[in-house]
Curated annotation (Swiss-Prot):
Pfam families: 7TM_GPCR_Srd (PF10317). InterPro entries: 7TM_GPCR_serpentine_rcpt_Srd (IPR019421), Nematode_rcpt-like_delta (IPR050920). It comes from the Eukaryota. Gene3D superfamilies: Rhodopsin 7-helix transmembrane proteins (1.20.1070.10). Disulfide bonds: none annotated. It is found in: Membrane. Signal peptide: none annotated. It is a multi-pass membrane protein. Its main location: membrane. This is Serpentine receptor class delta-55. The keyword DNA-binding does not apply. The gene is srd-55. The keyword Transmembrane applies. Belongs to the nematode receptor-like protein srd family.
Length: 334
């Protein structure tokens, strides 16, 4: 591999992140507007979870664009190659933003899973108090905060990272990323624990959410107090949350497995180096579309906005006029 070919994907990644940033923010802000203005009363409590997830995903999109990092594993170190606007503020800011990026990504996954847990508890108990809702949301920030804080308790030696990276990847042209950052010792307690939290989150969150989703659907089917329409809308929402939970599995597990393979064998996987950062935040770009489709009031609002949904006010007027001729008292009963 020549030094030139090692950066052949970079122009495409640059274009992607521009589309990702402006498109992602637009869709998330549209979703936030729908949550605030089109949520029916039945979604009043659920709205807190939706707003929380939307807010976190806006931050994640911003951090992904701010860093635009490429991940380059070494034998005993890990290089983070930023190409985003963070470079204007120096290596320390880029490395700090990278930690926040990982922490917020974990918090997004926990937030979506937390929404499913809330639906499960609401169906079982009938009502969840407002204080319990805020407690549930607050608890999801604990693992994420630990993931963010841990690296700041360890020493940073970017010069050593750069030296080791150039030695282990002599054919790579890394000048476009200078001065890049990273972990100089991946065997440290801080790096190991933070990585463990992220791995547990990637595997445990979908597993637990999948189980709870099946339980939620079972409870909805057994609920005799719900109308058929409410049951269908509730199940549709549950399916949407399940999609949001399992989307990260598709994005995370393949690239994470390739990263472990590259770390253990020292085999350079150029595409995976870029995809590791891209796919961690990619679900935040897609999630609004899942919400637009699976949350029925939002879908109806968008269809109404683009005039794709057939409205029935004319039919209602005709029916009322027809009935009024036969029985005027139906129209004016007072």
């Amino acid at each position: 591999m020549t030094s030139l070919s090692s950066n052949r994907i970079v122009p495409f990644v640059d274009i992607y992140f521009k589309i990702y940033f402006y498109g992602g923010l637009t869709f998330q802000l549209l979703l936030l507007t729908l949550i605030l203005t089109k949520s029916p009363s039945i979604l009043t409590n659920l709205k807190f979870f939706l707003i929380n997830t939307c807010f976190l995903q806006i931050i994640l999109i911003s951090l992904g664009f701010f860093t635009q990092h490429r991940s380059l594993p070494n034998i005993d170190s890990f290089a983070v190659l930023p190409r985003g606007p963070c470079r204007e503020f120096g290596p320390d800011v880029c490395f700090s933003a990278y930690h926040f990026f990982l922490g917020v990504a974990l918090c997004v996954g926990l937030g979506i899973s937390n929404t499913i847990i809330f639906r499960f508890q609401a169906l079982r108990k009938g009502r969840v108090s407002r204080s319990r809702i805020f407690t549930m949301i607050s608890l999801t920030y604990i693992p994420s905060s630990i993931t963010i804080i841990l690296p700041f308790t360890s020493s940073w030696d970017f010069e050593k990272v750069r030296s080791l990276t150039y030695i282990e990847h002599p054919k790579y042209d890394l000048s476009i990323y200078e001065p890049f950052v990273g972990f100089h010792n991946i065997a440290s307690f801080q790096f190991t624990l933070a990585t463990l939290l992220l791995v547990i989150g990637a595997y445990a969150i979908p597993a637990i959410s999948g189980f709870l989703t099946s339980r939620v659907i079972h409870l909805i089917n057994d609920n005799r107090g719900m109308s058929l329409k409410t049951k269908e809308q509730s199940k549709t929402l549950a399916y949407g949350l399940a999609c949001q939970t399992f989307l990260p599995v598709i994005c995370y597990i393949p690239v994470a497995s390739c990263y472990i393979f590259s770390q253990m064998t020292s085999v350079e996987l150029l595409l995976n180096e870029h995809l590791l950062g891209i796919l961690i935040c990619f679900p935040s770009f897609v999630d609004p579309f899942i919400s637009f489709y699976f949350i029925v009031p939002y879908r109806q609002a968008l269809l109404g906005l683009f005039k794709c949904r057939k409205t029935k006010p004319l039919n209602i007027v005709i029916t009322v006029r027809h009935l009024s001729k036969r029985n005027p008292s139906i129209v004016d009963s007072n």
